Structure formats: structure tokens, C-alpha cells
Amino acid sequence: MRLQVGLLRLVTMQQIESHARLTDSAFHANRDRMQQLVAELRAHRTTAREGGGAKYLQRHREQGKRPVRDRIERLLDPGAPFLELSPLAAFGLYDDEAPAGGIVTGIGRVAGREVVVVANDATVKGGTYFPITVKKHIRAQEIARQNRLPCLYLVDSGGAFLPLQ
């Protein structure tokens, strides 16, 4: 069945028939493993969202600064979604001392327009740039260029992380 609505054409597809046997032990083993992997993924994302950790977040607040995701939320239009890009950048790198690569990047809406946001997380090594940070930053800019979106930068950075330069 096809339905034309203005320029949008809706096409209904046939339902894909499942051949999974819900009583099969392999099905249960796969399901259990997938649930374990999803739980691990959620834990890694939570760790990345915590940035440099409670100690550095507290120090940041004592300096009168807002956490990176709070700054982003205040920048975006009220209720606007934020699609974070590469939240697990640097996972398993640098002894896990650069959660999310030290920056938060994503797509959100400001003044009614979609934008790419690049924001340093100063709780991660003072917002300094690791090699993966540079890659993540450049990738966000490429996405902005390809989609003709303006970039907004929330900078709170100590420059390059010198031990890795």
C-alpha cells in the first residue's frame, strides 16, 4: 500500500516473520548475553557522562563554573533534544582518564535552528585536548559542514594535553 502526502510518500512494508524459537536454549543464551552487553554499555555511558568524576566536578563548582552538560542544556531551546555524538570516545584509551574524549559534541536546537555544539569538559584534565579529542572535534565539524549546520563552541580548555603531544 502506498500513500502520498504532499512530498512525503509512505510505504507499508511486509512484516518480517521471526523464526526464533523462544524455548530454545540458544535463544535464551543469546538474550542473556545481549542484556549483559546492554547493561555494560549503559554503565560505560554513565561513566563517560560523569566526566572527570565527583572530585573534579566539585572543584569545578567551587570555582563558580557549570558542568558541561548543564551549559549545553542552558544553551539549547527549552525542551529541545540533544543528540550526543561519540559519547564513548576514548573508551579504553589513556588509562580511561579522558571520558568522552574530554569534550561533548552533538546536535541540538538554538533559537529554532539545528546546530552542532562542541563543548570542553573542564573536569577532564582541565578541558585539555588529547589526540582523540582532536579527532572527535574535527568529526563534529565535518558533520556540521556536510549538513550545513552552524557550530557553537563552549570553550573551557587548558589547550593541548602536553604529555601526549
Label the predicted regions.
Residues 6, 10-165:
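Terminal-region recognition feature
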